[in-house]
């Protein structure tokens, strides 16, 4: 069972105006400030869920809330193991195979709520500890999702992990919604998804609440307007564009997220 892809290259920073910039000079790829806040919010929600709540469907097809939490925990542990491998010059892939990944999620989703919570907390700690070992040379490396790829840049690891937490937090279908995403995360998300979005043609998205714009698939084409959170939700393949408007007759059609060299699968 697979969740929708919701990862892509993160550009770290954007100046005002419609473009997709790379990281600025003083951007620290190991800064965990935003990630820690996202992890704490996710943990509070996990702590609030009963066994009955965990068995309820999530917003993702065929997945319960327990499946989502299991995936987030195992993703964090996998990333921590990969980082540790890079630091100790013993590289490993995140997952042996997609089939094994899915089987592990299925198994953990059936665990007792206490074990599910413990694995999530262990993943949070392991990831932070692994990142703390990184130096400048390590950040220049790349990571494989599977033994035969795809590979992506190490500098995307922290923002990618944060996207896992924030997007899947909403996927749990609890009281936490995309409208609660922090503004810095919304900008980070739009930096990522506009770069990696395969679409039917070029268009521009304008986040009315943050006053910024991004091109998707090149310059030109219609404008799509809405809050940054609504735009990010739509561009990750979630929802039908509720809350968005366009100067065209309808919203542009979206293709699947590409698994390009700089993207990371869930």
What are these regions (language model features)?
Residues 2-8, 21-30, 84-88, 133-266:
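Structured surface interface patches that mediate subunit assembly and partner/cofactor docking
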Residues 101-123:
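A short, structured beta-strand-centered segment in the mid-to-C-terminal lobe
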Residues 43, 47, 76-80, 121-135, ...:
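Structural signal for well-ordered, non-membrane alpha-helices
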Residues 43-64, 90, 133-150:
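Helix-loop segments that flank and shape redox-cofactor active sites
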Residues 66-97:
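Conserved alpha-helical segments that form or flank metal/cofactor-binding pockets of metalloenzymes
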Residues 32-35, 113-120, 158-161:
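Hydrophobic packing residues in well-ordered alpha-helices of helical domains and bundles
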Residues 36, 40, 66, 73, ...:
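A structural signal for well-ordered alpha-helical segments within the folded catalytic domains
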Residues 1-12, 16-17, 21-62, 67-70:
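Basic, Lys/Arg-rich alpha-helical nucleic-acid-recognition elements, primarily the DNA-binding modules
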